Amino acid sequence: MKRTIITFILLLFVFTLHSHPWKPSHYVIIDTDGGIDDMRAITMLLASPDVRILGITTSGGALSAQNAYVKVKSLLNSLYHEGIPVGTDTDGRYRMKEMPFALQTVWGNEDGIDPINAPDNLSIISGLISAEKTKISFVCLGSMTTALRALRNIPDFSRQVKEIVWSADESGYLNGFNFKIDKDASEAMLKQEIPFRIVRSMSAQQGDLYTDELISALGKVKTPYAARISSFFNNEVSKSHRFSYFGTDEMVAVFLHYPSLFVNKANGIISESTPADPEGIRESTIRILKGETVQRNQVIKDLPQNPGFYYDDINPSVNEIISRYGIDEWTSGVLANELHRHLGTFAIIGVKMGIRAREYFNTGVDEFTAVSYAGSTPPLSCMNDGLQVSTGATPGHGLLTVRNDTILSPSVEFTYLNRKIRLTLKPEIANKITSELKEINFIYGLDSNIYWELVRKNTIKYWRDLDRHEIFEIEPLL
């Protein structure tokens, strides 16, 4: 009996390991003061599948906490990461004179963003710490104000936060800009027991991070994150300011991924990391913004992007689909239709919906639960196949539930870190797809090859033409 119990426990352990093939190396909460280098560092961290940004808080420094909040929300909204929670320092202490360049810098569309009713930093941090069981890195791109408030007011902060990662000037953290924003908080935090990793900026002797070669290379990277930073350098004001080219807070993003590019010196719980390989750092910046920080697949290294690899009818649309919607949607679409054993419109809708939900929360696969109201009757239920491939939420992982006991609809509820949203295919699109399928079924019948040829043709059309950012209604539930 004892041997049987031990065997059962070992099997459970093995199954647990296989249910999550890999997790991000870093779960982070970021505190920012709204500097231009903060925008670039945050964008790099958003780009990497090896980092999970749980939330972002804002404090005074380069900008007021409230203006920094507006900048952060505009960036997240423009990248379709609306579900990342953002807080601000509602106390409003330690206000400095704002930097005009930081205030002028565009992070995203600021229309409709009001910091007046923004949640307080502490409520954001407390909620995330209670929801996420993995140890967290608290990344400070500005002052120590928020970190100290959290340490003093959130009992689990010191237990759940494994390290403070702090951006510092090239000469070190003492008397640097971030240190001086709130000197009292800086001194108090350096005396507490959570390990400190202080990451210095690139030195003047090492040259600019953003050389002409790097800026040119950024323009060729086909991700929204690289495009965001590339667009910064298309602005005449940005190009005319010397600070634009320095490697400052971006070093935190590089250090988290590639610490070997830095010289690390430790003194007790405080370690300082100094950039040591400028060219390696530039190459790593490109790699991070490409999202090439982990292997995403389990069996194949990469799916071919060469149109010639695919059948003639889809061949002309390959480049356009990848260019418009990204490699993740393309890969998920290919795999979903192979799983589905035919090109299906609702399967592609499921792919697009799953990618959109992951975008919203900025998650990887296997990270949220999904409840589908598409039922188990084709063609609507075909949506579930696309959903599984694009999100990793499968019945085998215990992450997907398909409801058949209610009114069926192209709608799915996603829950992540105690937050829930509902995505629904817009009625006019759902009705058009359903009407087309009914019509060709009525004319040709399911047993006709012509029926499946027309379904295939329509699926390619919808895959190419339907933008996942425009076809779904998103309703926050929790």
What is each PLM-predicted segment?
Residues 293-343, 349-478:
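Non-transmembrane, aqueous-exposed alpha-helical and coiled segments at domain scale
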Residues 9-18:
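Hydrophobic h-region of N-terminal signal peptides that target proteins for export
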Residues 2-8:
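Sec-dependent signal peptide recognition
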Residues 245-254, 342-352:
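Active-site nucleophilic cysteine motif
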Residues 20-306, 394-395, 477:
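N-terminal acidic, glycine/proline-rich low-complexity segments
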Residues 33, 59-63, 320, 340-345:
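A short N-terminal beta->alpha junction/helix N-cap motif
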Residues 14-15, 45, 49, 358:
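Hydrophobic alpha-helical membrane context
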